[in-house]
Amino acid sequence: MKKLFASLALAAVVAPVWAATQTVTLSVPGMTCSACPITVKKAISEVEGVSKVDVTFETRQAVVTFDDAKTSVQKLTKATADAGYPSSVKQ
């Protein structure tokens, strides 16, 4: 029983290391009004694997945190393009 508990405790500590979370900043130059970020955020949020989205109109950027085992940057940029706001990775 002690070995089982120790194994579970170790797994709980090590599991976050295996998580494949990434953060990317997308440039979304087509946002032309203060309502545009709402549409962009909704489109990105609907992509499976996205855990956080911050969209800023002033800088025309979207900072996206996602699980790269479930989605990719290409899927994120496709989601914004499909919503009418083409985007690219900000270098």
UniProtKB/Swiss-Prot annotation:
Residues at which Hg(2+) binds: 33, 36
InterPro entries reported in the protein's UniProt record: Heavy-metal-associated_CS, HMA_dom, HMA_dom_sf, MerP, MerP/CopZ
This protein's UniProt keywords: Mercuric resistance, Mercury, Metal-binding, Periplasm, Plasmid, Signal, Transposable element
Signal peptide positions (record): 1-19
Gene Ontology terms: cellular component: periplasmic space
GO molecular function, one term: mercury ion binding
Domain of life: Bacteria
Record flagged with keyword DNA damage: no
SUPFAM superfamilies recorded: HMA, heavy metal-associated domain
Domain HMA residues, every copy: 22-88
Pfam families per record: HMA
Outcome of gene disruption: Merp-merT deletion mutant is unable to transport mercury into the cytoplasm and shows almost complete loss of the resistance phenotype.
Summary of subunit composition and partner proteins: Monomer.
Function: Involved in mercury resistance. Acts as a mercury scavenger that specifically binds to a mercuric ion in the periplasm and probably passes it to the cytoplasmic mercuric reductase MerA via the mercuric transport protein MerT.
Family of the protein in this entry: Belongs to the MerP family.
Protein name: Mercuric transport protein periplasmic component
Organism of origin: Pseudomonas aeruginosa
